[in-house]
């Protein structure tokens, strides 16, 4: 399988604070990879570094074989346009949505490349096939939705671009267990024929049997990798 993501020797953080330490990670096309760990151990920082939203101290990141960004001297946001061009979609944790927009407007805002905007109606239909509860809510302001529905909109927005790598940051955070499992189940329906997915979670049990690999994360380092069926030994 082709490599979608190759992270090598990455150290990253916020200003002088280093959160990620000499981290290596390879994700191949068609893979679903779970990264599990407690809050504050670097899962979100890893996503932000890949997306160009925080500083690197050192290391390299290849997306589809192309170098993206280099050092902290570039500053956060300096190569995010390249990340978008290469096809990276980050689905942030929590309620990071535009409350004043309708569901339809919010979804369409995720079609930020010329090609995806041209095909936004088709992409939107694909999202609605996965998140069926949103079909009758297209003209409803996002701020009036339930927590589970808002999370569906947030993930759906990330699906609107022609992405090669999907990064979902704790998609079940703050949701009732039944709703969280439904959201996660829908997320896992995304076709990864020519793409890949990383899901960050605190609860390893949620990902067991649902992803190809589960990797533990502690103190900014990845450790304890196992197949999803053998992951009970991984400690958060």
Predicted segments, located by residue:
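ABC ATPase NBD coupling module
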Residues: 68-89, 94-95, 118, 124, ...
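The feature captures the beta-strand-to-loop junction immediately N-terminal to the Walker
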Residues: 36-38
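ABC ATPase C-loop
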Residues: 158-159
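Catalytic Walker B motif of ABC-type/P-loop ATPase nucleotide-binding domains
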Residues: 166-169
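ABC-type ATPase nucleotide-binding domains, specifically the catalytic core motifs of the NBD
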Residues: 15, 55, 81, 103-122, ...
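H-loop/switch region of ABC-family ATPase nucleotide-binding domains
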Residues: 201-202
